[in-house]
Amino acid sequence: MRASVFSFVLVMALGGCFSPEPRFFTLERVVGTIVRTPPRVIEVRRPGLAGYLDRSSIVEKDSAYQLDVNSGTRWAEPLGDMIGRVLAQDLSQRLAGSTVFAESGGISANADLRVELDVQLFDRAGDGMVRLQGQLAIEDGSGHRRLSARPVALAAPAPGTDATSLAAAMSALLGQTADQVAQEIALMREAEEDLAR
């Protein structure tokens, strides 16, 4: 009897030592409306991230003052690099004919424009809404002259409560950000043409 109890306790203790393998998630490009502009070279700078987001585990808001860090779900790459990469992919699709690259990638070139995003909040709140808040700037590539700077405040419902749904909603918000950037770049070009007349 003692041996079987000991064996049971040993098996349970060893089972507690093994945790399941973490699951890895990524953000994906979201197709948007193509904006007609003359070809440009555009660099997407590595986004700044609020410290609570700059980690491998996926973070969600549990309440107004509490975060839930799930060690079983992780980002497949550093979140700042991934946001920059996906935003560059989104912009490349929307600005057909332009060359768009992420600062964190392997390409470097003299850019006509630089897009900068400072992410202050990017998570799912208790109400199921995923929010992206921060600052967005577009600057001239040669002289670092600021052409546009404004706040970003977007929200979208997550289609479910799992990490896949969170990643899908976050991807959609990056797509909306790319829509706004593409429109701003198109308006800048129109303003340049008006000044040249």
Language-model segments: residues:
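A structural "domain/chain start" motif
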Residues: 17-80, 188-197
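Short secondary-structure boundary motifs at beta->alpha junctions and helix caps
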Residues: 67-74, 142-180
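Sec-dependent bacterial lipoprotein signal peptides
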Residues: 1-15
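Surface-exposed helix-capping loop/turn segments at secondary-structure junctions
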Residues: 95-101, 183-197
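Soluble periplasmic/extracytoplasmic beta-strand elements of cell-envelope proteins
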Residues: 41-46, 59, 114-118, 131-137, ...
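Surface-exposed short loop/turn segments
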Residues: 18-36, 94-143
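Extracytoplasmic/secreted envelope proteins and their assembly/folding machinery
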Residues: 80, 84-88, 92, 171-174, ...
